Structure formats: C-alpha cells, structure tokens
Curated annotation (Swiss-Prot):
Membrane topology category: Multi-pass membrane protein
InterPro entries with a match to the protein in the record: DUF1275
Localization per record: Cell membrane
One Pfam match: DUF1275
Spans traversing the lipid bilayer: 10-30, 56-76, 99-119, 137-157, 174-194, 197-217
Gene: yoaK
This protein's name: UPF0700 transmembrane protein YoaK
Keywords: Cell membrane, Membrane, Transmembrane, Transmembrane helix
Family: Belongs to the UPF0700 family.
Naturally occurring in which organism (per UniProt): Bacillus subtilis (strain 168)
Keyword field contains Transcription: no
One term under GO cellular component: plasma membrane
Amino acid sequence: MTAAAYRNTLLSLLCLTAGIVDVIGYLSLGHVFTANMTGNIVLLGLAIGKSIQVTVFNSLTALIGFICGVIIATLMVGKAENTLWPSAVTKALALEAFILFVFACLSFYRAFVPVHILIILMSISMGIQTTAAKKLGIAGISSTVLTGTLASLLEDISGRLFFKKQKKTFLRDTVLRALAIILYCVGAIIVALAEPDFYHFIIWVPIVLIFGIMMTAKLKLSGEK
C-alpha cells in the first residue's frame, strides 16, 4: 500500500470509531449524540419545545463538550505542518484515546458517576477527532459530520451521471465519502447489537481502534510529505 492509501484507510477507521462512540452515547447516556452535533442540536430544540429538562441539559452538555474538544484540537493542530499525516494529528488522537480511556474506566461505576461527566468526556473526544480529521484535508471528511459528506457524495454521483466531462474524473473522493458513511453506520450497528450485554467490552473498541491508527501512522506515515 502507498502512504496515501494508508492515510485514507486510517481516516475511514476514524469514521467507524465515531459511529461506535455516537451510539454508545445515545444508548447509554440518555439518548444524546456525542459526535453528531447536527442530530444533537435537533434533540436540543425538541427538548426545549417539549420542556424536557433532562434532555436539554444532556444535549447542552454534549454541545459544550464538543466545542471544547474542537478548541483544544485547533490549538494542537491548527498550525501544524502540512504533511501527509502531521505529527500533531497523532498527538491529538492520543489525547482523544486518553479521554475515552477515562470514560471507559468511569463507566464501570456509572451508578456513582454523574451522567454529565460521561457525556462531556465523550463529546470532548469527538470534538478533538473532528478537528484532527479535518486537518488531513481528505475529500472534506471530518469523520463525524456526515451531512456534508453525504451531500458531497450525491453531488459526485449526480455529476458523473449527468455531465459527460465528469464521467472520467478520479473516483477516490467519491469512494472515500461513501466509505465514511458506510463505516459510520457499521459502527452504529456494532454497538446496537452489542448493547447492553457487551457494554463493558464495546466501550474499549474505539480506544483500540485509535491506538491502532496512531501506531500505523507512526510506522507508515512518519515523515511523509
């Protein structure tokens, strides 16, 4: 595999990670999205309209955590070198993995840990991942924001179907966008099947995935321009 192929594969695995984390949050933390802020804002609006205070606080907590994660990652990767895989991206993912590790440990004591602590940990981690993935600049994929990815995918397909000049254009971005959406859904399916019987196993999967991504990036992409 080429260095670019490794990079694209690792980004796709980040989408899988986001799908897993998002559904863990939705099913176990009071029906709140910790990665998909579009859906979370919709839930927030519905909760305000219906005067459901618990959902309002949960959604606001996730939104605040996500914003904090984006700010943290921006400070880490914002001025990083423009290489195939900037070292700052790996450092940001290491911080994300650590935060998810703390979440996983606290999850064993969910009866004693306020749910808002767990929500904010997960949403911070996803905010960090979103900005780190965007730094890679691959087909506009951020790993968590799928609405824009879906729109770009449909534009690609429509252009190839209806405009002759686009029929022979390179398919890489189209394939990556489709793969991002598919893997996000696969992550959601995995958690849906695992909950609740294998909850204490599934929460470690994103950590293992991110660790594997970091190691592969270090071994295969370090120093690549």
